[in-house]
Amino acid sequence: MIKIPKIGFVSLGCPKNLVDSERIITKLKAEGYDLVDSYDNADMVIVNTCGFLNSAIDESLEVIGEAIAENGKVLVTGCLGNKADLIKEKHSEVLSITGPQDYENLIEAVHTHAPIFVNDFVSLVPPQGIKLTPRHYSYLKISEGCNNTCTFCIIPDIRGKLKSRSIDNIMKEAEKLKNAGVKELLVISQDTSAYGVDIKYKSGIWNDKEYQSNILDLATALGDLDMWTRLHYVYPYPHVDKIVPLMAQGKILPYLDVPLQHSSPEVLKRMKRPAHTQKTLDRINKWRDICPDITIRSTFIVGFPGETEADFEHLLDFAEKAQLDRVGCFKYSEVEGAKANQFDNLISEEVKQQRLDEFMGLQAQISADKLQRFVGTEQQVIIDVINKDENYAIGRTKYDAPEVDGQVIIGDALERNLKVGEFATVEITESTEYDLIAD
């Protein structure tokens, strides 16, 4: 009897890395490998690493060590794979190291260390591939790499320059996901609004219609699928204004994830980010004029080298004026290889924490005030979790992305016959700083 090798798999890092993991697992399943969820049952373990922040590097190295201790046969891939010397220094027992999207060499290493002799299993893989997210939503990665030169970031060094997929290729995947039961698409890349620049917006055919490989045509085509479509990592370029009418028309969700990072022109210049604060505020107001329903999410960094008290006050003032709906904030930390590491005037950890607390305290109040408007209204939600023991469900409105935004806590889930992955209409009875409650 032929023994089918069993592969353990650990996926670390961001949603883009999760998509890479899905592609690797799909390839392994197509060749007949079994995927298992524990180290001790596996013949070998693959760790798909993150190598962006120092904390992510530490986590990746720790997980690699755990896999070696528990299993002994470990392959490493992903962003940290670009630092093979570091991995070998810490864990010389690692069998193979490959970088991000280096699927061919990773699979070759799997063949070497866990050979398989039965490889006609393509029919066992669903058309949409293997997904690691819940069945009802999926990340849709439209490009790799980035052409920006932000001083705090090393993504171009890790993943290379922008490499966009053709629009017809993306739409074929999106259609497969819909046919598989996916109801929400989360469009991701390093810079979604730059999609297609590198391939000169080349045209493609989908459903007998010609589209250009640009973000407007892509959003238009995705809107025709009649799914929840959510755009992430969108820089506030002028052409984004053309997408917002699609949100007002209900074609795609009224949601934009715009990573602004700061508001102070001086800080933004040091970050090598767009530094036109008033233009950004004007653009946000324009979006709200076009689509009053729009939810704008952003992320910020406090404590960047050289950030003065005046710079931080500028950020607080911007938060008051912008009234953003969803906000995340991080203390600046060095990333090995980033240009910002050479900057002077470092901010102490104590000051970073104080600024983080003050900024998020302000944003919590803004969020609480904005969520109050939902009390007494009916909202459509998609159900993510059912807790049968305590008889409640967790869902999300169209204004909230999974994992990073707020939730709707719904009582009497069993009596309502709520089901994970299905839509329901609920009445909002309370709101908190970040979440809504429905009875």
UniProtKB/Swiss-Prot annotation:
Its cofactor is [4Fe-4S] cluster. Coiled coil: none annotated. Keywords: 4Fe-4S, Cytoplasm, Iron, Iron-sulfur, Metal-binding, S-adenosyl-L-methionine, Transferase. [4Fe-4S] cluster 2 binds at residues 146, 150, 153. Residues 132-369 form the Radical SAM core domain. PROSITE patterns: MTTASE_N, MTTASE_RADICAL, RADICAL_SAM, TRAM. SMART domains: Elp3. Catalyzes the methylthiolation of an aspartic acid residue of ribosomal protein uS12. PANTHER family: RIBOSOMAL PROTEIN S12 METHYLTHIOTRANSFERASE RIMO, RIBOSOMAL PROTEIN US12 METHYLTHIOTRANSFERASE RIMO. This is Ribosomal protein uS12 methylthiotransferase RimO. It comes from Francisella philomiragia subsp. philomiragia (strain ATCC 25017 / CCUG 19701 / FSC 153 / O#319-036). The gene is rimO.
